[in-house]
């Protein structure tokens, strides 16, 4: 990624199949998303035209019935657009040896990190079944993004579409941070209804970060803004959740909230460079 040419780095961008099942329809309604989903190359062109770098991934889950874009396709997209893109992979860590061998293979092929979604993958982040997977990732010092908090996926569906919100509690991630102190962790989203817990985990564990994706900044809780301006100013990351929320919308709303001028470049770019190992220094957690 050619960071010197970028104004920001979006740490949370989905590459998705162009499906339209019930879960997709509910998510579009929740996020007020309109229009067709962008193709992978349209995603690249969107970000390049705005001089924004992005971390791209799909999600390996079977709960919603939405097919995963293969990790290999995401990696190939990022390789073809290496000036602006980094590829993360998604693996279901509850698959035991298969998850471990898949992680090993992906790391050997240069994947830059991993994305996990406990509510959709139906596991607690601190379940010991996932620990062999974490051991491989931690040894390679690759970052892991964990979905935390409420899930827009399933909202409004009968039975929440089967999505159990308990799996999004950031206190589960605290255990992982204790047991794998050399593995950089990004807790995705303002973690409603556990925002205080997420702030505490991020403050307490040096390798834990928070991305601000999935919410318009105008809805950020006051305590999140307070800590982003002060004690967590070097641990908060710009993320949009594109295509559900566009960077255009997110950045316009971000301009209107009371973030200090000297903190804005940290959130928009500099903190991401550090956790992603793009600043030429030893990666966080290493």
Predicted feature descriptions by range:
Residues 53, 61-155, 164, 282:
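Active-site gating/metal-coordination segments in enzymes
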Residues 46-47, 106, 137, 176:
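Generic structural signal for hydrophobic
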Residues 8-11, 55-57, 88-89, 115, ...:
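Active-site neighborhood of phospho(di)ester-bond hydrolases with catalytic His/Asp-centered motifs
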Residues 112-113, 127-237, 282-285:
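Catalytic pocket-lining loop regions of alpha/beta-barrel enzymes
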Residues 8-18, 145-149, 187:
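Histidine-centered catalytic micro-motifs
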Residues 1-14, 20-49, 53, 232-237, ...:
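Mid-to-C-terminal alpha-helical segments outside catalytic/metal-binding sites
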Residues 12, 74, 106, 114, ...:
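Conserved, mostly hydrophobic/aromatic
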Residues 16-19, 61-64, 93-97, 150-154, ...:
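Active-site environment of divalent metal-dependent phosphoester hydrolases
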């Amino acid at each position: 990624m050619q960071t010197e040419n970028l104004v920001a780095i979006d740490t949370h961008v989905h590459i998705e199949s162009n499906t339209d099942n019930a879960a997709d329809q509910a998510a579009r309604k929740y996020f007020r998303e309109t229009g067709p989903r962008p193709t992978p190359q349209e995603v690249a062109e969107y970000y390049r035209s705005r001089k924004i770098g992005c971390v791209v991934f799909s999600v390996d889950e079977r709960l919603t019935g939405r097919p995963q874009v293969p990790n290999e396709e995401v990696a190939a997209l990022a390789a073809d657009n290496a000036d602006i893109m980094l590829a993360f992979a998604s693996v279901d860590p509850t698959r035991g040896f298969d998850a471990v061998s898949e992680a090993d293979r992906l790391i050997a092929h240069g994947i830059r990190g991993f994305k996990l979604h406990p509510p959709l993958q139906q596991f607690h982040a601190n379940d010991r079944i996932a620990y062999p997977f974490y051991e491989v990732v931690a040894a390679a010092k690759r970052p892991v993004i964990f979905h935390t908090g409420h899930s827009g996926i399933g909202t409004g569906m009968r039975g929440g579409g089967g999505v159990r919100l308990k799996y999004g509690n950031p206190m589960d991630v605290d255990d992982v941070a204790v047991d794998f102190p050399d593995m950089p962790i990004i807790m995705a989203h303002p973690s409603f209804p556990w925002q205080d817990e997420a702030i505490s985990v991020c403050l307490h564990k040096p390798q834990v970060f928070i991305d601000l994706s999935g919410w318009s900044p105008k809805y950020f809780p006051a305590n999140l803004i307070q800590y982003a301006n002060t004690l967590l100013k070097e641990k908060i990351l710009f993320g949009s959740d594109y295509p559900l929320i566009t960077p255009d919308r997110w950045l316009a709303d971000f301009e209107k909230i009371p973030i200090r001028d000297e903190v804005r470049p940290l959130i928009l770019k500099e903190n991401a460079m550090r956790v992603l190992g793009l600043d030429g220094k030893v990666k966080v957690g290493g």
